[in-house]
Amino acid sequence: MHQNTESVAATETLAEVPEHVLRGLPEEVRLFPSAVDKTRIGVWATKPILKGKKFGPFVGDKKKRSQVRNNVYMWEVYYPNLGWMCIDATDPEKGNWLRYVNWACSGEEQNLFPLEINRAIYYKTLKPIAPGEELLVWYNGEDNPEIAAAIEEERASARSKRSSPKSRRGKKKSHENKNKGIRTHPTQLKASELDSTFANMRGSAEGPKEEDERPLASAPEQPAPLPEVGNQDAVPQVAIPLPACEPQPEVDGKQEVTDCEVNDVEEEELEEEEELEEEEEEELGEDGVEEADMPNESSAKEPEIRCEEKPEDLLEEPQSMSNEAREDSPDVTPPPHTPRAREEANGDVLETFMFPCQHCERKFATKQGLERHMHIHISTINHAFKCKYCGKRFGTQINRRRHERRHETGLKRRPSMTLQSSEDPDDGKGENVTSKDESSPPQLGQDCLILNSEKTSQEVLNSSFVEENGEVKELHPCKYCKKVFGTHTNMRRHQRRVHERHLIPKGVRRKGGLLEEPQPPAEQAPPSQNVYVPSTEPEEEGETDDVYIMDISSNISENLNYYIDGKIQTNSSTSNCDVIEMESNSAHLYGIDCLLTPVTVEITQNIKSTQVSVTDDLLKDSPSSTNCESKKRRTASPPVLPKIKTETESDSTAPSCSLSLPLSISTAEVVSFHKEKGVYLSSKLKQLLQTQDKLTLPAGFSAAEIPKLGPVCASAPASMLPVTSSRFKRRTSSPPSSPQHSPALRDFGKPNDGKAAWTDTVLTSKKPKLESRSDSPAWSLSGRDERETGSPPCFDEYKISKEWAASSTFSSVCNQQPLDLSSGVKQKSEGTGKTPVPWESVLDLSVHKKPCDSEGKEFKENHLAQPAAKKKKPTTCMLQKVLLNEYNGVSLPTETTPEVTRSPSPCKSPDTQPDPELGPDSSCSVPTAESPPEVVGPSSPPLQTASLSSGQLPPLLTPTEPSSPPPCPPVLTVATPPPPLLPTVPLSHPSSDASPQQCPSPFSNTTAQSPLPILSPTVSPSPSPIPPVEPLMSAASPGPPTLSSSSSSSSSFPSSSCSSTSPSPPPLSAVSSVVSSGDNLEASLPAVTFKQEESESEGLKPKEEAPPAGGQSVVQETFSKNFICNVCESPFLSIKDLTKHLSVHAEEWPFKCEFCVQLFKVKTDLSEHRFLLHGVGNIFVCSVCKKEFAFLCNLQQHQRDLHPDEVCTHHEFESGTLRPQNFTDPSKANVEHMPSLPEEPLETSREEELNDSSEELYTTIKIMASGIKTKDPDVRLGLNQHYPSFKPPPFQYHHRNPMGIGVTATNFTTHNIPQTFTTAIRCTKCGKGVDNMPELHKHILACASASDKKRYTPKKNPVPLKQTVQPKNGVVVLDNSGKNAFRRMGQPKRLSFNVELGKMSPNKLKLSALKKKNQLVQKAILQKNRAAKQKADLRDTSEASSHICPYCDREFTYIGSLNKHAAFSCPKKPLSPSKRKVSHSSKKGGHASSSSSDRNSSCHPRRRTADTEIKMQSTQAPLGKTRARSTGPAQASLPSSSFRSRQNVKFAASVKSKKASSSSLRNSSPIRMAKITHVEGKKPKAVAKSHSAQLSSKSSRGLHVRVQKSKAVIQSKTALASKRRTDRFIVKSRERSGGPITRSLQLAAAADLSESRREDSSARHELKDFSYSLRLASRCGSSTASYITRQCRKVKAAAATPFQGPFLKE
C-alpha cells in the first residue's frame, strides 16, 4: 500500500479528494489528514467498526508494474491471463477511498489486512476499530496470528466453495473474463508498499496460492493482494495475500459514482465475465457473487462495504464468487503464511472440523477460522444488509446480494415465480433503487421477465437495491440465467458472451447488436420511469429474440387460445398495450415467453411495456422504453411477449413513425404491425417450438391451432412475419377472411387479444426474434437482430398503432405479406378488391385507415406476431429457403424484414417526403429491388418513406411505383414472404399509412403486390373497421401470381403456408436476391435481404443506394453490412445496394464480377478472377432460351431436358468474353457486350425457364421433403457473401435475369445449390460434395450418365434451386413446392397443382414439371392413404414381428440390416434376378413408368432385392403395403413419393425411384419389414420392368405378359387377395408414360432392347421370387398369401401403369 517512504510528491488535502471518493465512503469512516503520514489524507473511523468487516474493492488502473510510477497507491494482483498486474490508484480520480488508507508502521497499529478476492483487493478489519482510530493496513499477516487465522479461514472457506464444480467453472470463467481486463481497478493502490512484500508473497505464499487459486479464477488474483511496496524494506514481510474468501465486488470503473460505483462497474464487468462462465455453467452462485458485486453499484461505496460476511457467508452467497474468493484469499494470505495457509486450505477444511460454531451448524478446522466466522453472528449493528428473502443479515451489500442471488437462482429455476430478489426489496436499499435499477439495467427485468412479466415489473422496481450510501442500485438480471448485474452493460455483456453465442445454435442468435428500434416517442415514455421492468424486456429482446424462436412457453396454449382463431382482437385499449404481462418460463428463456407466455396482456395504450426492450438503450433510458422511440434497441425484446409488461407504443407509435430509426419507418409502419399479429405455425414450427428448450405447446394448442396462431403472427410486421414464415412454413394458410385476418377481429382485439396475439407470435416465433417485431420499420430493416429483439418493435407497433394507423398499414404490409413478387404490381391495383383470394388477402395493403386506437391495437398484435416472425431462424427457414431457392428464401426472410421496413417507410408516407433513391423511377425491376432497401432507408426518415410510399408505392412491397415492374414488387413480395405471419399482420395499417401517402392506392396496390398476400386480410384487420376483404383486395391482385417472384415460397404460401413464402428468412439471401435480379422476385429480395443484413450488422449505416439514409442508415446500423465495395471498401446492407453503388466507380473500374460484385479495372483481371475464383471459363449460351452455362454439359443437358423437340445449337463465348453483367456501367455493356446472340423470343426461354425452374423446384421440394436443411449461407455472393468463393453449380449457372439486372451474384447461382463452408459444392443429383467447380462438372457428367438411380437432387442435399419459378401469367409454381415442404414437415397435404399445370400449359412442354409434380403428388397422396391402411394392417400382423431373413431365418433388429443382409450376405438366399438387371430395369424402366410404386419400390437394386427378400419374409405376415405403398409413414413417404414422382418426371431416372424407395423404406422402417415382403419386392421389380416397358412398347408388352403370368400363378394360389389388388394397383397404375425427355429416358430408350432382355430375365427371376413367395405364403398362412397376391396384382398394375399413365397425365 502507500507507504510513507514513498510519499506523494505533494501534500494531499481534503479539497483535492474527488467527489466520487467522498460519495463512496462508508458511513463508519471519514477522511482526515493521516496521523502516520502528515503529507497524506487518512481514513478515520467515525463509528465502531467490528472485526471482520470488509471494505473494498480497491479501485485503480490496471497496469503493468513497469507502468506504475508510485508504489504507494498500488496493489499487485495476479491475473491468470495477464500475469502480475498492478491496481494503481495513484490518480485519485481512478481510485476510491481505499487509496487513502495508509500503511501501518507496526503490527500494533495495523487494524486492516488486505484480502484478494476475485483478483480484487479488499481490506478486512483485523480487530475492532474504535471511533477516532485511523484505518491502517499492512499485509504481513504471517506474524499476526489473527491475520493468519483469518487468512487461513478464508482459504478454507474458499477451498470448500471452490470444491464445487460450479464454483470451479465459475472461477475459471471469472478468471478468464477478468484477465480480459474487465476489471481494471479491482486491487488497491497500496501496491507500492505491497510491491516488495508482494514479491515475497509471490515467492512464498503467493506462488503456491496462485496455483491453488488459479483454477478458481480467483487464485491468480490472490498474489496481487500483496503489492510490492515502495519501501520494500518496510513492508516486505507484511505481504499478506488478501484472503479471497470474499469474492471481490466487481470494481466499477465509475469512480464518479463513488468507489462503490467504481466497484460496481468493475463488478459488472467482472460479473459479465463471470456471468459468461456462470451462466454457461448455470452457476448462479458464483454469478451471484459477481452480480451481487455488480448490483452493488454501491460497490463503489461497497469498497467501503465491510465484508463482514465471512468466507462462509460468501459460500452461502453465490458460490462462484465465494469459490473464487476463497481460492484467491488463500493465495492472498500473508505470503509467508500463504504456503501453510494453503496447506490448511487444501487439507484442513477437508479434514475434520474441530471447532463448531455455537450459533450455527458450521464447524471449523481451526480456532482462528471459527473466530473469524463469529463475526457473522455479531450484533446485527454491523450487518445492515438483510436478505430480502430470508432476512439473513450480512455485513456487506456484496455478501447479501451474493446470498440473495442464491434465492433468486432458485426462483429463476421456477419459471412461475418472479425474480424475488427484484420483487423483494427487503433491503430498503433494494426498494429504493428499484426504479433506478429498473430503468438502468434490463438484466433484472430480464430475470423478472423470465420468471414472470408481471412480476418482472415489480421485481424490476425492487430489483434496484439501495446501496450502503443510500444510493439506489439497479439490478440487471440476465433474462437467460437470472443472474443479476449491477449495470445493464454488464448484464448485456454477460448475455452476449454467455447466452447469445449459445443461442445461435438454437437459431436465435442475434446477428450483431440487435438494432434498437427507436421506441415510439414519449407516448410510451410515461412508463419511462427508469424501471427495470421495461428494461428487462429490451434486455431480453436481443436474447429473447434468439430465444423465442427456440422456446415457446407452456403458456402458448393460453395465448393461442386467445388467438387461436387467428385473430387478435384489438381495440384502442389494446392498441395501447401498457403492460403485457407474461409468465416467464422456458419461453421467457427464449424470449418466446414474451411472445407465447400467457399473454395476460394488460394493454393500455400508455403502457411502456418491458417491450421497451425495443432497444436496450431505450430501456435503460426509459424502462418504459416508450421514450426511446428514436433509440435503437440493441436488442428488441419480443414486443408481443404477453408476459412482458409492454406499454403499447401505439400512441407514441404514431408520433414516432419516424421513430423507428433503424428502419426509419414511420410509426405508422409499426402501427400496421400493431394491427393484428397472427402467427401461423406450421407443423414444423410447432415441432420446433415444442422441441425448443421448453417450447412445449400447451395441451390447448393443437396443430391446427398453431397454424391459426401463425396467421395471427402474420399480422405481425412483415419483417417479423417473413421471418416466421421462413422459419416455419404454415402447412395451410388461414383463409384470407379467417378471423385472424379479419380486420374486425383485429380491431376488436383487446389486451387479452393482445395476449392471444402474443401467443400466436410466440408460436410463430419459434424464432420470435425481433423479426416478429419487424413491425417497426426500423426494426424490420434493422434486420434479424432487431427482429430478434421483438419487444421494441412491439413498442413501436403499439405507438404507431395509436397514432399511425395508416403508417402501420404500410409496415404491416411489409412485415406481413410474403411479397408477391411476380404479380405484385398487378395486385397492387387489384389489392383492394379481393379479400377472398388467400394470397391477395396476404397482400391486403388497402389504404384503410382505422382509428388510431384500433390501429394501435393491431399494431400491438402485429408486434406480437413479430416475435413469431422472428422465429424464422428455426427449421422452417430451411423449407422456405428451399422453396425460394436457398438464396431467395434466405434473403426472403431477411428481406422480408427490410421490405417490411420499406413498407413502413411508405407507411410513414404521411411525411410524404420523396425518397431520393426510391423514387418511383427507381422502381425498375432491379432498381425496384434496390428501391425497397432504399425504402427501408427512407423508412427511417418518415418523409422519405412517405415519398417512397407514393412514388414507389410501398417501400415494402416495392420501392417501385405500383407501375414499377412486377419483378420489383415480387422482390418485395419475397421480402415479405412470411405469409403465415403476414396474413395475420394487419396490412391495413400499412395501407393506412399509404393513405396518408400521396399514393395510398398505389401503396395498397404495392402492398398487394408486395408480400402480404395472406397478411393482407390481416392488414385489413389493421384498418379493423375495414373487413379483411379490403386488405385482401390489396393483396388480391397479387394473388398467387404475385407470388411468382417469391415463387417457391410465395406461391406455396397460400396452400402451404405463408411460411413457405417467407421460406427464405435466411439473412444471406440478400445476395442471392441481388443475384437473381433477373428474377423480379430474386432481384427484389436481394435488396431487401441486404438491407436486413446490413441493418443487422451495421444497423443505421445508410446505404449508398438508399439516400433516405435517415431511416435506412438506422436500419443499416442495426445490421452488419455484409457487402463491401472492393474499391472504396464501403459496406452495404445488400448486394443490391452495393451494385447500385458500383456505378460510382464505373469510370475507373468498368468491369465487375457478376458473382461477387467485385470491380476490376482491366478486363483480363476480371476474366482471371472469374475463372480462378468462380470457375467460369467459356460460356455456352443456349440458342433457344439464351440461358448461359459455364459448362457445355450443362447446356446440353438443359437442351435435352427443356428443348427436347427443338433443334438446339449453342453459342460459345470465350472465357474472356464479357457480358452486360460484367460491366459496372451497363450502358457500356452494349458497346462491348459479348457477341450478341441471335435475338429469339424470350417467351420460349421464359417457358423453358419455368420448366427448368419447375424441375429445380421439384428438386428443392424433394430436398425439403427429405427434411434436409438448406444452408442459410448463400454461396452465390462469393466475396461479399461470407462463403468460400462461389463456383457456379451444375445448374444454369449463367442464367441472365430477364432484366439483365442484378446479374451479379445470382446469375450463376440462380439455380445454384446453396453452398456453405461444409458443402461448398454439391452435386444436385447425388448430393456428393466436391471441392471445386471443375470437379463438380466432371462429376455431373459422370453422375448424369451414371445409373438413373442417382436422382437429380439428393434427397438430403439441401440444395434449393435458386431460380424461382415465375410463370408468365405470374402464377408461382413454387406454390406446390411450398405445399410439399409442408407435407414433408409431416402433415401430408393434398396439393392442388391446378395453377402450376395452368402455367405449364403455356409452356406446352410434353411433360411439364408441374404436371408431373401434380400427378406424382396425387399418386403419392393416394399411395399414402393406401399406405396408411396397409400400415395399419402391417402393424396388426407384422409390426410386432422382428425382421427375419426369409432365407436363413436370421433375425435383425433393423430393417436396414435385414435388407443389407438379404441383399448381399444371406448365404441361403436363392439367386434373385441379378442386381444389375434389377437395377437396370428399375433404373430405366422405373424412370419410364415413374409409377409411384416403382418409385417407392425401386431403389437401388440392392434395396429392391432386399425389399424383395423382406417381402418374402413378410409374406409370413400379411404385408399391408407394397414397397411403393409402404412408404412407411404415409406422411413422410408421401412427400418422398411426390418428390420422386417429380424427379421421375424430370429425369425418368430410376435414381429417383431408388431414392424414393429408400426414403420410403426409411420412413416406414419400423413397419417396412412387414410391409415389404418378397412379393412386394418382386412386384417392384415387375413394376420396374413395366416401367422399362413404357420406354419400349415391346418391353412393356412382354413385361405385362410376364406379370400376368406371375399374377395368374399367384392368383391361383392366393385368391383371397383378389379384392384388394385392383385398388392398390390403381395408384401405381397412375404412371405417366410421357415426360420430359431426360438423359435417363434417353438412356432407357437406347437400352430398350437390352432392357427387354433384361426385363425378360428379371421377369423370370421375379416369377421365381413370386413362386417362392407363394410358397412362403402357403407356409405362413392365408393372410400372407393374400398379401402376396396383392403384391402380384400390384405388379400387374404396374404393368398396366403405362396405359393408365397417360390418363393420369391428362
From Swiss-Prot:
Compartment(s) of residence: Nucleus
Basic residues bias locations: 158-183, 1474-1486
Biased composition (Low complexity): 733-743, 1010-1019, 1034-1062, 1487-1498, 1548-1563
Boundaries of every SET domain copy: 27-140
Superkingdom of origin: Eukaryota
Listed PANTHER family: PR DOMAIN ZINC FINGER PROTEIN, PR DOMAIN ZINC FINGER PROTEIN 2
Function: S-adenosyl-L-methionine-dependent histone methyltransferase that specifically methylates 'Lys-9' of histone H3. May function as a DNA-binding transcription factor. Binds to the macrophage-specific TPA-responsive element (MTE) of the HMOX1 (heme oxygenase 1) gene and may act as a transcriptional activator of this gene.
Name of the protein in its database record: PR domain zinc finger protein 2
UniProt organism field: Rattus norvegicus
Gene coding for it: Prdm2
